[in-house]
């Protein structure tokens, strides 16, 4: 098996769904923009690219019609580069990169661009629900259809995670991201994108279309306080503890990653940033899908002969504070190694792109700190966990 390396990973800034600067931007255009940035930054001949693999949490409407192929054709890759689309919900970006890595490791490909995208704005309210529910599943395993917020409430109640603990974790995420953003730690991974977006006047209801640029993440709230978080009403149950403040925010964005065999990267004179070392998935009860990493992480580490303490940095998708806290504490992960620059509660969580975003940031942070191993992991709708292991090239 050949060594597989990550040469580069880029993303758009993240914009608030419905109200942000991507609310008129197609997801395939966002992902194609990222692909073009990878080609330009690495002076890469598109004829060398064997495939374009794109993950998305919704595969219909604006993200239908094999968006992976559409991204290849829209971008500088062109007609000669094939493309595919996959869906493992919130791990779709990580899954796309894992598939690419395995294709390269097996010798079937040399160079692949892979990642993920999500325009929640253009897809969430137009989901086709015709024949959506299987009656047998609905009767026997109803949790598989629960909204994600409902599963977060179940995790909080089932495992005794208090509202206060969730709010404190959310504050930590906001503060860590604010510091990282102020220090420019996201600058290298974000490729600015010009957009047209719609703005509605709240008083008159009048709408206008403006020109803009997304060159930073716009979803975070640097002025967040514990008092402000405590004042928010529960979002999913009247007597619940999950709020808009301690859950990830609906957001739009794309991220794409450039993978190669080590030999190809060196032959092209490109600097490998990290080795892809492994990927695992595991199932759990659908009604507590947020704890999926508790099952996929040990499976990954066992396969690689590692322990929790061997991992220097952890990136967990941070869909909800309740599941973040449970996973961190159950796995006994050091909080100082865990989402060190904030997670999706602050940054935003476009479902399909998050895994690629996490990888791009993890690789950079490992190298900044001169550390070795990092794990990207996330919960997955339907009751799953996904985890990937990466080793920095130092």
What are the residue ranges of the model-derived segments?
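Active-site pocket-lining segment
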Residues: 151, 189, 195, 277-346
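N-terminal extracellular/periplasmic Venus flytrap/periplasmic-binding protein-like
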Residues: 10-13, 24-33, 41, 168-262, ...
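Conserved beta-ketoacyl condensing-enzyme motif
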Residues: 22-111, 116-135, 190-214, 288, ...
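Active-site-proximal alpha-helical scaffold in enzymes
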Residues: 86-117, 156-186, 256-263, 328, ...
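Condensing-enzyme catalytic core mediating Claisen C-C bond formation in acyl metabolism
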Residues: 1-27, 224-291, 295, 302, ...
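Short, well-ordered amphipathic alpha-helical segments that serve as non-catalytic structural scaffolds
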Residues: 27-43, 67-71, 96, 148-155, ...
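Conserved catalytic cysteine-centered active-site region
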Residues: 56-110, 130-131, 142-150, 223-249, ...
């Amino acid at each position: 098996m050949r060594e597989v390396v990550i040469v580069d990973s880029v993303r758009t800034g993240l914009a608030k769904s419905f109200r942000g600067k991507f609310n008129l931007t197609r997801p395939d255009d966002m992902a194609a923009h990222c692909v073009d940035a990878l080609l330009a930054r690495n002076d890469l001949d598109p004829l060398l690219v064997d495939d374009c693999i794109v993950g998305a949490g919704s595969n219909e409407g604006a993200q239908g019609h094999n968006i992976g192929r559409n991204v290849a054709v829209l971008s500088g890759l062109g007609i000669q580069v094939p493309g595919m689309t996959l869906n493992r919900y919130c791990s779709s970006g990580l899954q796309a990169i894992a598939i690419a890595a395995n294709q390269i490791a097996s010798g079937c490909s040399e160079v692949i661009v892979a990642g993920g995208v999500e325009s929640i704005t253009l897809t969430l309210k137009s989901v086709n629900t015709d024949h959506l529910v299987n009656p047998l599943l609905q009767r026997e395993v109803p949790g598989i259809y629960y909204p994600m917020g409902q599963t977060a409430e179940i995790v909080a109640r089932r495992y005794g995670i208090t509202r206060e603990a969730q709010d404190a974790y959310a504050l930590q995420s906001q503060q860590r991201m604010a510091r990282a953003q102020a220090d420019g730690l996201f600058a290298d991974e974000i490729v600015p994108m010009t957009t047209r977006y719609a703005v509605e006047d709240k008083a008159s209801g009048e709408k206008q279309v403006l020109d803009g640029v997304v060159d930073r993440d716009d979803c975070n709230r640097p002025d967040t306080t514990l008092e402000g978080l405590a004042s928010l009403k529960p979002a999913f149950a009247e007597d619940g503890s999950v709020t808009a403040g301690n859950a990830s925010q609906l957001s739009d964005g794309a991220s794409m990653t450039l993978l190669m065999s080590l030999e190809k990267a060196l032959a092209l004179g490109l600097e490998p940033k990290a080795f892809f070392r492994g990927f695992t998935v595991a199932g759990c009860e659908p009604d507590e899908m947020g704890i999926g990493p508790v099952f996929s992480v040990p499976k990954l580490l066992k396969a690689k002969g590692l322990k929790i303490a061997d991992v220097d940095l952890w990136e967990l998708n941070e869909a909800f504070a309740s599941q973040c806290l449970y996973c961190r504490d159950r796995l006994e992960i050091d909080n100082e190694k865990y989402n060190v620059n904030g997670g999706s509660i602050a940054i935003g969580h476009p479902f399909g792109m998050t895994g690629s975003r996490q990888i791009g940031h993890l690789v950079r942070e490992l190298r900044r700190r001169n550390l070795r191993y990092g794990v990207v992991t996330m919960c997955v709708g339907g009751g799953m966990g996904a985890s990937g292991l990466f080793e920095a090239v130092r």
